Amino acid sequence: MSSSALQIAKTATYLPDLVEVQRASFKWFLEKGLIEELKSFSPITDYTGKLELHFVGEEYRLKRPRHDVEEAKRRDATFASQMYVTCRLINKETGEIKEQEVFIGELPLMTERGTFIINGAERVIVNQIVRSPGVYFKDEMDKNGRRTYNASVIPNRGAWLKFETDKNNLLYVRVDKTRKINAHVLMRAMGLSDNDVVDKLRHPEFYKQSIDSANDEGINSEDQALLELYKKLRPGEPPSVSGGQQLLHSRFFDPKRYDLGRVGRYKINKKLRLTVPNEVRTLTHEDVLSTIDYLINLELDIGGASLDDIDHLGNRRVRSVGELLQNQVRVGLNRLERIIKERMTVGETDSLTPAQLVNPKPLVAAIKEFFGSSQLSQFMDQTNPLAELTHKRRISALGPGGLTRERAGFAVRDIHPSHYGRLCPIETPEGPNAGLINSLATHARVNEYGFIETPFWEVEKGRVMKEGNPVYLSADLEDECRVAPGDVATDKSGNILADLIPVRYRQDFEKVPPHQVDYVQLSPVQVISVATSLIPFLEHDDANRALMGSNMQRQAVPLLRPERPLVGTGLESQVARDSGMVPITKVNGIVSYVDANEIVVKDVDGNEHVHFLQKYQRSNQDTCLNQRPIVKNGDQVISGQVLADGSACEGGEIALGQNVLIAYMPWEGYNYEDAILVSERMVTDDLYTSVHIEKYEIEARQTKLGPEEITREIPNISEESLNNLDEMGIIRTGAFVESGDILVGKVTPKGESDQPPEEKLLRAIFGEKARDVRDNSLRVPKTEKGRVLDVRIYTREQGDELPPGANMVVRVYVAQRRKIQVGDKMAGRHGNKGIISRILPREDMPYLPDGTPVDIVLNPLGVPSRMNVGQVFELLMGWAASNLNCRVKVVPFDEMYGAEKSHQTVQAFLEEASKQDGKDWVYNPKDPGKLLLKDGRTGEPFDQPVAVGYSHFLKLVHLVDDKIHARSTGPYSLVTQQPLGGKAQQGGQRLGEMEVWALEAYGAAYTLQELLTVKSDDMQGRNEALNAIVKGKPIPRPGTPESFKVLMRELQSLGLDIGVYTDEGKEVDLMQDVNPKRNTPSRPTYESLGTSEYAED
């Protein structure tokens, strides 16, 4: 055990800061990205060239945010800072310079945890992985089966340039997928002579055919080439030489229109072995000529030229927050530039000031649009700390400038050898997004160019150099090295022991002697993501199930009393710390004060550092965020130490579930098909009880008939129902509420038309005006109950920002404790999930030889076909650990300590546990890992010994309370008039095509008819049916479904003369829908059957 714990400690020290990818990127944006953009737009000149506006980018300044993070969340505000930049307006005619600091917009700021607060909600900007700008060479098969090659020059922004060859060995070029143009026409248009081109090529004879072809077409000069280019790129417009020059310049040589970016320039220089300076971001003649030369070498199959794999991580780069935000700022500044130019032209030149020219709105709008509605700005998943951390490390191929789900093929989604140590091969969603959304591997980092790097130890002459710092390599560099896996066995001084080592070299595997190894992987965990690295014995699980295990850990609900796993991997504390859920001290010192709300640390100099704790806050997913101190008064603390536990944390480690005693055996069919049988102890001891906080909100608005009022005086409500309301009509904090109870009383003025006829009659007789208001109170929804935790009232008088038309907003937070119940979903860490089918009294559960009843009974058939044997290792290791009263840390991939190491370790632990006093029954060498259980109901032993042990089991966020739903009558869809779907819409259950086939197969014609008509979209029929049921009359005959009428109308709108006709050929007017026979039942009703029976008596 010590070696496992020790090794992981050694690995864990190198785990980098897990949210660094977000923070570093935003820091870059503030320090460089924003200044770059402001500089690139400076100067802005008007159309006459008389005025110039310069942004002095280096001198931009951010004001202190108006609200801090907590206040922004409370007020539904954005945690943002105002940006000011110094502007100089220069009048070229008079030489006058006006300088002014101008407000250019609000910039949302990143919190310490790597998130943004937008309108009070915490959001995360997901990293995007896109194709890197650069030059790419591909081969394609034409329709005759001949292989052709093509080269694409892809800029960061601007027109794509694609070179291709045809069967006659002619070179063509396409600009942005337009028509093909002879490549030499482009060369001539760029001002290159035939000799310029030929001299640069290593094999000019191939290219000479293209020159001849151009001459044959009569394009001999630069002017003719420019005309030809203009004709092809702008067909239908009169061509001109100047137009051609301008077009060519703006497409490829204008830095504002065409930008390869730093990355694009770096990649092109690297691929084509050029020495163009990094500052040159547009195309050069050299780039184009070298691309053609490389393409010819491919065609002639000359060594040194290689094709590119677009799925290789060397050709894909990550765009993080900083860059995405920079692109958005560019969009805003583009709009601003147009406005400034217009204002320069319109305004009085002498009296203009920079502040009058610069309008902050376009930039504010662009930034707001990005944070509010971009596909990459997502509502943070706050179910538990792991979900939060994983969300910040997510890498998506979707979003603007990326792929779409429909277009993405298998190749993009597949695992690529270059993902090794960079993207996790396991953690990705199931379903349409599989492989498009990935997670960063544990040790990976993103370099300045946006390529993902991963660390290795250097190997010199067969010795692993662990003394220095690890070397970070990008996918391109790693391909050229021989890299050994992290679990190679070494002696104490780091010499590799085996004679032949498996290595990866150029995306292939080979075996080499130790002195040929260049690098060794840093740790066995570096291949996988954070969530996956929390699965113990991962190497014994099938990848599909490990994927489910990784994803389900993110859905674990924080429990009331969390418990650390008995069997962990050693990364639990790092995950808790980096998720930002636990407060950490930044100084060495002594704890001078502790209570439930704050912890004060006094440092060496006597300064006090106060840490406020979160108490029962609602998370984005309605789970409960609460922090509990774990230090005592007078404790000594060191910098970086955890002071309190957050939700789903215990002792500074992440604790997503509970360690429970599990037996693998069938029990009366209650665990058929992955169902789970649990003991009542889970309910009574609150093992799986969680707190959920719901937010209810109501606005008092200004209506046409007068203002709505929040009041205690609600018409037709008993005094009893108002017991818990205060004098304003708002529920008091601490009150217990059930579904249907009033939270906030509100009345709305009622117009004349709203009054029922009987009220009009009373008014006519008595002449007095009853109070004409309607009850519109906020009530607790069906299936919800709980205790009022907090009430917040927002009014304009207090200075709160309210939505337009609202006079007052009241928010009520209701907390509920949810115990585990039948229908809840539970899961282990190995993808073994199931639904609770029954909760048994503990006296009926199977029990151990010492009388302990088990907590959960799982089906043994869930293991063999799913091949997630890791759960069995965890079970037995947990069993040994609980008997030895210790916790175990197991490194995934432990073969470096010897073959079959997991097996040996577990066995050794079990033997150790059985040596304790009175514990000899714990391990039976004849039936290792199994015990003979007895039936709690009869006391008889079961036929076979059963695998029993402790496993870490989670309760997932898919709770039955949130899913269970019923409808009698409810809302209908507007067009089809069919009931809506889903719980939120109070919808019905869908009767789909296949269900109709089932009823047809049974010949249940009447059942089918009423399901398709009166129970669905026969509008008149359903009203009559309801009326008939209420009055106890026979149910009338169904009419025409509304969706049939919609179908008819749709066919008619296509110009088809289509109608419904009777046998006699008379057209039926569906829109009229009055059926004279409607009231005579088309089948015997229950009532008519009953009466006829009595008549016979």
Curated annotation (Swiss-Prot):
Pfam families: RNA_pol_Rpb2_1, RNA_pol_Rpb2_2, RNA_pol_Rpb2_3, RNA_pol_Rpb2_45, RNA_pol_Rpb2_6, RNA_pol_Rpb2_7. Its EC number is 2.7.7.6. Keywords: DNA-directed RNA polymerase, Nucleotidyltransferase, Transcription, Transferase. GO terms for molecular function: DNA binding; DNA-directed RNA polymerase activity; ribonucleoside binding. InterPro entries: DNA-dir_RNA_pol_bsu_ext_1_sf, DNA-dir_RNA_pol_bsu_external_1, DNA-dir_RNA_pol_su2, DNA-dir_RNAP_su2_dom, DNA-dir_RNAP_su2_hyb_sf, RNA_pol_bsu_bac, RNA_pol_bsu_CS, RNA_pol_bsu_protrusion. It catalyses: RNA(n) + a ribonucleoside 5'-triphosphate = RNA(n+1) + diphosphate. One of its GO terms (cellular component) is DNA-directed RNA polymerase complex. Residues 1077-1091 have a biased composition (Polar residues). This is DNA-directed RNA polymerase subunit beta. It comes from Prochlorococcus marinus subsp. pastoris (strain CCMP1986 / NIES-2087 / MED4).
